[in-house]
Amino acid sequence: MKNTQNHLNMSYVWMICLVAACGGLLFGYDWVVIGGAKPFYEAYFGITDPAQSGWAMSSALAGCVFGALISGWCADRFGRKLPLIISAILFSASAWGTAVATHFDWFVFYRIVGGVGIGLASALSPMYIAEVSPAEKRGKFVAINQLTIVIGVLAAQLVNLMIADPVASSAT
């Protein structure tokens, strides 16, 4: 009976860790996918100024800085789960907002909102994973978060490749 209970507990820990590590996946994905979207949002918003284009790309990182700065306070005040849920809501709002933005300022605003969510998750995901993991397996579980960041980067590069190929083909 005890062996079955341990197996169920480890399955639960794995599930928690994989869900929490989605913060890393989103961080890696969002960090890179904007590069592939660059020609599309530049054309859509009529961007010709390199500074404006750079702001569109880096604005999420400004939000990340803010999210990371407040993450410790949020974790101490509200625990780990609620701020992680809020980070997922912020990222979802960012995805929706950037998709429907009709003005460049709104596009940047929603990129910053998503950045705050990613900044929260990038600090809180490994913290939460470490807290729910058994001490003897903590390193393995926390490393999953870093792995998901790299998987997010890879996924974004693959998406960018799929987007860029048709654009390059139609340009010739």
Tell where the protein language model's regions lie, with residue ranges:
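Transmembrane-helix signature of 12-pass secondary carriers
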Residues: 1-172
